[in-house]
């Protein structure tokens, strides 16, 4: 998990 998309499971990895 990076930073922003932790709430969706870091699918995008942004």
From Swiss-Prot:
Q: Of which family is this protein a member?
A: Belongs to the FGGY kinase family.
Q: Which organism is it from?
A: Streptomyces griseus
The secretion signal range is: none
Q: Which GO terms describe its biological process?
A: glycerol catabolic process; glycerol metabolic process
Which terms in the Gene Ontology molecular function aspect does this entry carry?
ATP binding; glycerol kinase activity
Q: What pathway is it annotated to?
A: Polyol metabolism; glycerol degradation via glycerol kinase pathway; sn-glycerol 3-phosphate from glycerol: step 1/1
Which keywords appear in this protein's UniProt record, sorted alphabetically?
A: ATP-binding, Glycerol metabolism, Kinase, Nucleotide-binding, Transferase
Catalytic function, reaction form? glycerol + ATP = sn-glycerol 3-phosphate + ADP + H(+)
Q: Does the keyword Kinase apply?
A: yes
**What activity regulation does UniProt give?**
Inhibited by fructose 1,6-bisphosphate (FBP).
According to UniProt, the name of this protein is Glycerol kinase
Q: Does the keyword Metal-binding apply?
A: no
Q: What does this protein do?
A: Key enzyme in the regulation of glycerol uptake and metabolism. Catalyzes the phosphorylation of glycerol to yield sn-glycerol 3-phosphate.
Q: Which gene encodes it?
A: glpK
EC numbers, comma separated = 2.7.1.30
